[in-house]
Amino acid sequence: MSVQNHSKLLIVDDLPDNLRALDALIRDDQRLVFHAHSGDEALALLLEHEFALAILDVQMPGMDGFELAELMRGTERTRNIPIVFVSAAGRELNY
C-alpha cells in the first residue's frame, strides 16, 4: 500500500511514555501515526495533515485536550475529525 493511502492518526499527550504506549496499540501497516507533545504542537500538525482520527490527552499543561477539541470543532478543516479522549490520571477508590 502506498503511503498516500495510509490513514493518518494523531496522538497528543505531554508524556512520552503515554505516546509510546498508545502508538504501540494503534500502529499497523496501513496507518501513519503522528505525535504531538502539546496542544500547540498538535495545531501545527492539524494545519499540515488531514487526519482520520485524533487521540487527545485530557490533562496537559497549557492547552488541555478539551480546549484543543473545542478549537478543532470550531475550524472547518478539522471539525469532522473523530476525537478520542484519554487520560492517564488515576484516582483512589474507597470501596
Each model region followed by its residue ranges:
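Receiver (REC) domain alpha4 helix and immediately following alpha4-beta5 loop
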Residues: N94-Y95
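Short, conserved "switch-loop" micro-motifs in signal-transduction and mechanochemical regulators
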Residues: T75, A89-G90
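Two-component/phosphorelay signaling modules centered on CheY-like receiver
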Residues: P16-F34
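Conserved Asp/Asn-Gly motif in the active-site loop of CheY-like receiver
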Residues: A36-D40
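Active-site beta3 strand of CheY-like receiver
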Residues: H49-I55
